[in-house]
Amino acid sequence: MNRVKMPAPPAGVSAIAWEGLTRFQQQVYRAICRIPKGQTRSYGWVAQHIGKPAAARAVGNALNRNPFAPLVPCHRVVRSDGSLGGFAGGPEKKRRLLEAERQA
């Protein structure tokens, strides 16, 4: 059987849990780990960055299922108009996380 080598998990993420993700989720989570602290990128930017420019909504769905927050910083992804968009902890928590990163 041919095995495709999957990218290694981000620092602090269990390899066993990482293997339970889809390839798409892994790509999304690796991409958002590269967003610098205190900065944001849009769902569309993430989709473009992983080579799937029409998948912005799917990126949002993957982030909604992120079991590794805040190690995988989904709070750094916002809507294309710059508004916060969704976040499991609510928009106020997302805003506070971003503000804390900007001040650090």
Name each model-derived stretch:
Residues M1-A54, E92, A100-A104:
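Basic nucleic-acid-binding alpha-helical/helix-turn surface characteristic of O6-alkylguanine DNA
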Residues V28, L63, P67, P91:
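Short amphipathic alpha-helical/adjacent loop interface patches that line ligand
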Residues P36-K37, P67-P73:
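Short, proline-centered helix/strand-breaking motifs
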Residues A54-N66:
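Regulatory, non-catalytic segments
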Residues H75-E92:
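Intrinsically disordered, low-complexity basic tails/linkers immediately adjacent to helix-turn-helix/homeobox/MYB/SANT
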